[in-house]
Amino acid sequence: MKYLASFRTTLKASRYMFRALALVLWLLIAFSSVFYIVNALHQRESEIRQEFNLSSDQAQRFIQRTSDVMKELKYIAENRLSAENGVLSPRGRETQADVPAFEPLFADSDCSAMSNTWRGSLESLAWFIGYWRDNFSAAYDLNRVFLIGSDNLCMANFGLRDMPVERDTALKALHERINKYRNAPQDDSGSNLYWISEGPRPGVGYFYALTPVYLANRLQALLGVEQTIRMENFFLPGTLPMGVTILDENGHTLISLTGPESKIKGDPRWMQERSWFGYTEGFRELVLKKNLPPSSLSIVYSVPVDKVLERIRMVILNAILLNVLAGAALFTLARMYERRIFIPAESDALRLEEHEQFNRKIVASAPVGICILRTADGVNILSNELAHTYLNMLTHEDRQRLTQIICGQQVNFVDVLTSNNTNLQISFVHSRYRNENVAICVLVDVSSRVKMEESLQEMAQAAEQASQSKSMFLATVSHELRTPLYGIIGNLDLLQTKELPKGVDRLVTAMNNSSSLLLKIISDILDFSKIESEQLKIEPREFSPREVMNHITANYLPLVVRKQLGLYCFIEPDVPVALNGDPMRLQQVISNLLSNAIKFTDTGCIVLHVRADGDYLSIRVRDTGVGIPAKEVVRLFDPFFQVGTGVQRNFQGTGLGLAICEKLISMMDGDISVDSEPGMGSQFTVRIPLYGAQYPQKKGVEGLSGKRCWLAVRNASLCQFLETSLQRSGIVVTTYEGQEPTPEDVLITDEVVSKKWQGRAVVTFCRRHIGIPLEEAPGEWVHSVAAPHELPALLARIYLIEMESDDPANALPSTDKAVSDNDDMMILVVDDHPINRRLLADQLGSLGYQCKTANDGVDALNVLSKNHIDIVLSDVNMPNMDGYRLTQRTRQLGLTLPVIGVTANALAEEKQRCLESGMDSCLSKPVTLDVIKQTLTVYAERVRKSRES
């Protein structure tokens, strides 16, 4: 209830705040209006100032023109003075000039003596002034020119116009200025003197200018002019009723057009300024004051303030009207908003109060516990009686866990077992209540349901235990059958190499096929049983996916060749050299897919494509077999499921292989998919994550950069892969169309070359070739299509074979030097298992090799110390001394004979460990006769060459 009361108070406060907002908006409009009026006033002041400046320019021109006249008259007077007699020379006169008489300026002035002395000078000056008046004075509007002697201060008046002379006024003005001039400091006495006296009517006066005349650096006389000044000439035509006043240097009014009542006195604020613009004290007038050089006078223009405001009066009235209208509009809007928003909101608050009371009653009467918990600390804000009872059953730890779950917002329900063994299921949703984040919780007693689920779980566990027991039984039986089967299969393989009576060979072949199928079935059942009983674990470690793929193709290549199929293995350059995973299980999956592809393909080829796909390693197995119908693809990975009818039923199997593959890949965090069409073949794609991937360095094979290889490959996929691989190694690749090669060029083809190749070598990719590349004739190499990624290494050996021909370890075996009689080779077989040891010895005997056996590494060292051994075939994992320690001990004794490891763990790291211990090679069980023959041929030839050297 307090919440709703607070809400109503908030609404009331919001109403007052809205009114305050309206007032602030009105004040903002008022301030904007004032700013606009002030801006208009400044603009009007700028216009008036511009008009004042233009008018003052006319006054300045008047003063400047008078100053120029004084300079001309002074020049005339000084240049006509005779330096010899101190008089103006009258030469050049043609007419007689009127000579003015001297008049005393002071009572003690003696003008009679001066009249006689200056008679000639005055006559000459009068003639020149008369000449100047007739030709130039009209342009300057002068009234008279006068000359005053410097000693006795008598004045000679040269009238230029016929106008009455107010002698007393003029003499008084001259008397005052002459005294001022004579008493001035020496620095100021050499400058011109300007003043103005009032005329017969307002706005008209007389402007006087006085300048000294020197002769031989001695003041001889004072020359002056009088000119009528009219203030009306200092106005521009306009609408402003402006006044104009000229002040002296002390700020006293000399002449004004506005009348004595409006005369402006000098203001200390602007008397020292050359130019000043502003309002007078009391803001009665707007004035502009400017000096009039070269005189010491100043001119002041003024205009009443009411005339300034007259132009913006309408702007002021409009602004006032705008503020009144804006205030009325804002007041109306505020009232309307209150009536339509705030008043209805207060009514809604009252209704909410009623609704909350109603909801409280519903919650209190609910058959389940309902409560509201604060998200921050889990405190119970509101709850019914049942929820209160349930919450009291919870322990402190349960309350803390419930609070953490609510804060985490990861799940929406939790099951809790209370202290009295009551099972509560608490579900909740997040919401807002009283301005807080809360969780609305519903508590339900699910004890009955939990007991039922426990009963069902016990039944399921019993069934699971029975299933696991069955799986364990199958796994145990299958494992016990596998060991003797290895001996059966190996001996049957050896028996097939013997000369058998007619009909017996068919029986042996059937026995061999049945044994292999039985071994495959037992292995699948064992793996599936381990998966079902959760005993099969993924053992991740670092391995090389390249080595795993090479090993798989090497195992299945003989079977592919026997079926007259082609096996292409494309390992892209972006495949990591190492990653973390379970190589044994990956090998099992790919081997199963490859085995199925061989089994269901009668013609065509099989492609194994390995590449990096983002963060995954993608392995694709594609065949040209019978294909799978779309409706059966969805059940392809079900246990014991076999595809279709007809031809598919001719292939035996348990139907567990793909189910095991899917489960293994899923355990490795990968996925497997299939794309198939009947009659077109199938494509299986396996993806595993690239955990801890290490990528190869992007650089070419040393020594191959710039070499040229010609491609004449019909298979488009093989051609594209070879081109990319060779270019990555720095080799120049060109399509061969019959061009003439250079002696260093190599031809790469997948068909028989009709004519002799004139280059360095020919490499032919053959689907029937098994094993490492062989040189069948000088410069003619045969290469398996199952390992095209090894072509750059072969090319490196082809180009370097002449440089390293003296090293027998780098020599390649060739078929023309193969030895069919191997009785000169003594091979030591080391294996702790008697059947495997005997089987391997028999296989070597069938190939013509001499053989000795040893039980373990210690026994092998004893045999080596007493007999000459050429090659050692040793099991890796043996008691007493394993194959690794045997090899290391052999190398420590200084023996360099080839040591070949034989292991059941045919993984990349196992082979790498064998090589690091000092072994020359490593074979994987089961070891077939073909693999033994091919491997021993290489090392036997190496031993024979070392004997010859």
Curated annotation (Swiss-Prot):
Residues modified to Phosphohistidine: H479
The keyword Phosphoprotein appears for this protein: yes
Residue stretches making up the ABL domain: 705-805
Matches recorded under NCBIfam families: PRK10841.1 (NF008099)
Modification after translation, per record: Autophosphorylated. Activation probably requires a transfer of a phosphate group from a His in the transmitter domain to an Asp in the receiver domain.
Places the protein is found: Cell inner membrane
UniProt protein name: Sensor histidine kinase RcsC
Residue ranges of every copy of the Histidine kinase domain listed in the record: 476-692
